[in-house]
Amino acid sequence: MIRRTIPQKTISNEVELNGVGLHSGQKVNIKFKPAPVDTGLVFIREDLSEDNMINANIKYISNTDRGTNIDNGIVRIQTSEHVLAALVGLGIDNCFISLNGPEVPIMDGSSKDFIQVLEKAEIKEQGILREEFFPDSPITFKDEESGGEISLVPYENYSIDTTVDYGTKVLGTQKAYIDDISEFKEEISIARTFSFLHELEMLLDNGLIKGGDLNNAIVYVDKPLDDSNMEKLKKAFN
């Protein structure tokens, strides 16, 4: 079922941030620009001369291992999850997101900096109502390999409830929920990227987290390290 009850929103002014890509380690500039109604959230790769745009659409998701990557066969965007969470969390429907590289900057590992700069851009309502999907019956998807499961059920209000368990005593079972998207800024946006210590060697060996450090991620120590591995990590993270 599609409902139209809330006006679409965009930003009033262009704003920007500078940072580094978590996995590429490359310096990157990101700009947020106002967009007309029914545009959606659109990434623009300034470093590509033509055919440089891609919509933030589920059909373009190419990989979700250590980040949400989208790819339309021409344009690729890596680690899009934090910036998209900020835009959705603030109720922004239409925005051009311009990058001078393939990866969104990691900032401090959360959505906080994106929230702050988007609020400075002054969010405004537009003249057309937003289309919102409401399920008529429960929808469930389960990934048999990972065990992850997501369910969407009919409900008159907004509610998200999540549980994660990585099978480690260091972290344990984690639960979180919000009953209104307006809670995103205070309750969710400051949540930061994390990793377990045992994963770092594998990530480095696969050419990832080149821009990672303790300023943009939390590392849970879940195993002892010998001297050689400790030196390897020290060298990687300066």
Task: Please describe what each predicted stretch is.
Residues 1-238:
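Short acidic-hydrophobic catalytic motif
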